[in-house]
């Protein structure tokens, strides 16, 4: 522990306030914002595709729940990133964006990111049940029950936000470095009683969901391997066996892709939260504040990436998604062409009337 503390003490002075601001501009204002804009469009498309396919099965309902949490996560993180844009901060507005974003951007994003993790854990668990109890799973996890479970996930994960919103609000305060009185983050006199509680609860939710996804995915991969081997041995028709084998491999690749995306993108956040708990002064008000903020901004890149690339997974692995996706854009293209043709005809008609 002493060695770890010494390491952080040697690193922290290297990050000055000016350097921290540069890191925040690059990671938040540039990188995360760009990825987030793509993700917003991608998740809107995901939602439209799943609605067109129909929300009459537990799989589509689960994916819809994931798309909604991803969309809300990206909306809040986009606002968070805008709040650190120097042009916005120095504009003539009556509030200080880095202060206001805590309750309107940063904290809600943390909540929706945890919801995404738990919905992913549920989807992985559901797939695990499908391969373990294929004949009973449709009776166990009906569309109605899946919807109730997703609503429960949203509700439970939102509960840790209560202590934060009960002891903090947006109000007028004086900013000495600006020599202005602006709207900013203000704490109540009861703040000390719950300080850090929301952060702790979100950390616990993140660790548990992270482990749950890893465990369920590992079980699913093992079960798929067993099922694939059993089918190859027990099926006499080689062509049918090959079809089953391809289906199993496709499902396995989907699971591996989903697990890899989640594990890779959440690993930096897991390391970040671990550092907060084991390294003294590595927090928003501690000696290593700048290092804390730079690390948090770095983690936001991966949060944004995780919520933005699901459309690639669906499009690559699901032929049904690809078909609906192509139908959707074909419809949009036909409408555009029809609109352009109608405009041209109206223009020609107007020109003819003018000549007459």
What are these regions (language model features)?
Residues 1-42, 85:
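Extracellular N-terminal segment of 7TM GPCRs
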Residues 1-15, 226-252, 285, 319-356:
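Intrinsically disordered regulatory tails of 7TM GPCRs
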Residues 2, 32-36, 72-92, 113, ...:
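Helix-to-loop junction signature of class
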Residues 8-17, 87-111, 159-208, 281-283:
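Loop architecture of class A 7-transmembrane GPCRs
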Residues 21-33, 59-124, 130-133:
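Extracellular TM2-ECL1-early TM3 structural module of rhodopsin-like
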Residues 69, 186, 219-271:
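Intracellular effector-coupling site of seven-transmembrane GPCRs
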Residues 72-76, 83-86, 108, 112-122, ...:
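Fourth transmembrane helix
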Residues 212-213, 261-264, 270-274, 294-344:
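Seventh transmembrane helix
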